[in-house]
């Protein structure tokens, strides 16, 4: 227990020292806090282009934005990727290269057999008395629950493997910068 008190020559009663006037050697100063809270540029993506990464995400090159949301923009089939800024480069690269390695329970892929003989594959969410199935092309199909014959969960992600391969190393680094750095201002 740390007991910090003070007194003066005119008043010898011991009084607690106000914390605002007490600076311990291990205290983090406000300027250090500001520096610590500034985004750190991972060396793997240094020199890449945040704006090009955004274009890759929302464009036809990687088509990420068809299924995924970042900061309110994009599709609603796959997980919202806004919180990737809290993750490390290696784990994000693994998830991009091996989308079935870890699948969020809310985004499991299902094969849905309908009573009319059709079969739909994708992520499933409920909206009232309906199911909304999102496929790998980014399309949403709304069906009534009473139309479903059977649903079976798959062990594979709706996101196909190999989507990032055509980007090459520079395109992948640009995409990673967009996903891992909160804003273009922080990317500089």
What are these regions (language model features)?
Residues 2, 6-46:
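Long amphipathic alpha-helical scaffold segments
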Residues 12, 19-26, 118-120, 124-130, ...:
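C-terminal capping alpha-helices of c-type cytochrome domains
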Residues 28-59, 89, 115-117, 161-164, ...:
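Electrostatic cytochrome c docking/interface patches
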Residues 32, 67-69, 106-111:
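Short coil/turn segments at secondary-structure boundaries
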Residues 45-48, 76, 154, 158:
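Alpha-helix N-cap/N′ positions at the starts of helices
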Residues 60-71, 81, 175-182:
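The canonical Cys-X-X-Cys-His
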Residues 73-98, 109-154:
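Gly/Gly-Pro-rich "capping" loops immediately C-terminal to redox-active cysteine motifs
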Residues 93-102, 106-112, 116, 168, ...:
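Short glycine-rich, low-complexity segments
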